[in-house]
Amino acid sequence: MTIADNKKAFFDYFVEERYEAGIALEGWEVKAIRAGRVQIKEGYVVIRDAELFLIGAHISPLQSASTHVKPDPTRTRKLLLHAEEIKKLIGKVEQRGYTLVPLNLHYARGRVKCEIGLAKGKKLYDKRETEKDRDWQREKARLMREKA
């Protein structure tokens, strides 16, 4: 079940490969995510010391969050992947033009997972082409409905 999608990622990047990663979360973050108070549109993934981190994802704390814990909505969160997957991603990201972007948050067997994509940035003309294709698909569907 999907919690949050990053629709902007598909507009700004060509996503070539997808990986499912676990996220190291605190208790208040899990509760807030279950309440749907998460946004990953501004998030991105960085590699530091052979580890992946999700930066810029915003999880709004609930009013009932603990008083002895100071919730930080945009803290850096560690992503959990197998070592060989991380090595593969490091090799790809070091190539020119590749980056890692969060695509969505979802539940897998009761755990919150983050799907990350190995992506290449789109140029402005690529974005325009994508928009034209989407508009044409919408127009085509409308015409087919009118015929039927």
Swiss-Prot record:
It is found in: Cytoplasm. CDD domains: SmpB. One of its GO terms (molecular function) is RNA binding. Coiled coil: none annotated. Gene3D superfamilies: 2.40.280.10. InterPro entries: SmpB, SsrA-bd_prot, SsrA-bd_prot_CS. It holds the Pfam family SmpB. One of its GO terms (biological process) is trans-translation. One of its GO terms (cellular component) is cytosol. It comes from the Bacteria. Residues 129-148 are annotated as: Disordered. Required for rescue of stalled ribosomes mediated by trans-translation. Binds to transfer-messenger RNA (tmRNA), required for stable association of tmRNA with ribosomes. tmRNA and SmpB together mimic tRNA shape, replacing the anticodon stem-loop with SmpB. tmRNA is encoded by the ssrA gene; the 2 termini fold to resemble tRNA(Ala) and it encodes a 'tag peptide', a short internal open reading frame. During trans-translation Ala-aminoacylated tmRNA acts like a tRNA, entering the A-site of stalled ribosomes, displacing the stalled mRNA. Belongs to the SmpB family. This is SsrA-binding protein.
